[in-house]
């Protein structure tokens, strides 16, 4: 189980929790979105809200995939491929949120 330190709250962020990575390091989903809301104020609030819902869905999907049990090598490969695809999508959404400006 991988474990990181959230750069906003300094608490641990571990496999099985909703967190992502920015250029600053690991960050809990809730910490990241709250920080961006505060930083942006009312500017880009609607766009942030939309992207936050997307990122939440992607991170939830990743957590659901972690619970899937596979018993064959093919199943494990397919699961790993799907996990990487969703992980990449979550990374792209995180970058879009990070790029939002006032």
Regions found by a protein language model. Give the residues of each.
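Intrinsically disordered, low-complexity regulatory segments
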Residues: 1-23, 29-102
């Amino acid at each position: 189980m991988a474990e990181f330190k959230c750069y906003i709250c300094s608490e641990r962020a571990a496999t099985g929790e909703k967190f992502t990575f920015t250029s600053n390091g690991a960050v809990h989903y809730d910490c990241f979105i709250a920080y961006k809301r505060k930083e942006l104020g009312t500017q880009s609030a609607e766009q942030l809200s939309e992207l936050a819902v997307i990122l939440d869905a992607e991170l939830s999907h990743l957590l659901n995939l972690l619970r899937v049990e596979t018993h064959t090598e093919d199943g494990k490969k397919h699961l790993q491929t799907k996990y990487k695809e969703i992980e990449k999508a979550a990374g792209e959404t995180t970058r879009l949120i990070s790029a939002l400006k006032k």
